[in-house]
């Protein structure tokens, strides 16, 4: 049991070193919320209820320190409702216009093929992907092709994140069942211990 605890403490230490620091994570979250509020507040979207949310590693809490001189990559989606008639190019151009004239992000905007990138000075950038809802119940969306000419690729960042969370919980439950069945020397893991072990890998 002592060996198991020692091994876990080493793994947890490694995970904590790989993660975004709490201060940088807080800063990234605040900046994401600022951009989301700025976009939604634009008059163009006064009658359109946008949905904005993180995707990828930032949503899953699996963001790790990049190699060499690379930056942290924070991704989020600006999602139009199902009945919206706005094209990918129109939504993309509105995001660019808003951020280039909001008094904060003017010189930080970089145009990418399928997303708008905001570059920050402290080693991370934020990629904003246009999207449109396909099925609000299943969270399926459609995102643009590389030319931003049409809604083309189907995606489901929220659905994948929910699946990932369930798999992580299932893995811990299976692990507990395994040890409970085959090793009578292993102490019962409390719910709090399970959460503390799971969190750094999410």
Question: What positions do the PLM features span?
Answer:
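Nucleotidyltransferase catalytic cores
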Residues: 1-15, 156-160, 167-202
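N-terminal regions immediately upstream of nucleotidyltransferase
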Residues: 1-71, 80-90, 94, 115-118
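Conserved catalytic core of two-metal-ion nucleotidyltransferases
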Residues: 39, 43, 92-151, 155-185
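Glycine- and aspartate-rich repeat motifs characteristic of hemolysin/RTX-like Ca2+-binding segments
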Residues: 75
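Short, charged/polar low-complexity linear motifs in solvent-exposed/disordered segments
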Residues: 78-80, 145
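Short, structured coil/loop segments at alpha-helix boundaries
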Residues: 21, 25, 42, 135, ...
């Amino acid at each position: 049991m002592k060996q198991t605890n020692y091994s876990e403490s080493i793994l947890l230490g490694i995970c904590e070193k790989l993660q975004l620091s709490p201060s940088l994570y807080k800063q990234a979250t605040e900046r994401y919320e600022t951009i989301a509020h700025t976009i939604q507040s634009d008059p163009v979207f006064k009658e359109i209820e946008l949905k904005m949310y993180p995707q990828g590693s930032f949503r899953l809490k699996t963001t790790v320190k990049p190699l060499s001189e690379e930056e942290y990559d924070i991704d989020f989606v600006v999602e139009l409702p199902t009945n919206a008639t706005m094209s990918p190019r129109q939504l993309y151009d509105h995001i660019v216009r808003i951020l280039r004239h909001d008094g904060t992000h003017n010189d930080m905007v970089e145009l990418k093929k399928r997303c708008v990138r905001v570059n920050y000075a402290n080693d991370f950038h934020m990629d904003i992907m246009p999207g449109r809802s396909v099925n609000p119940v299943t969270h399926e969306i459609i995102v643009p092709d590389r030319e931003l000419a049409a809604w083309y690729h189907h995606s489901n960042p929220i659905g994948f994140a929910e699946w990932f969370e369930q798999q992580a919980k299932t893995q811990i439950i299976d692990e507990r069942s395994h040890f409970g069945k085959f090793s009578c020397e292993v102490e019962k893991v409390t719910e709090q211990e399970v959460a503390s072990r799971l969190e750094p890998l999410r």
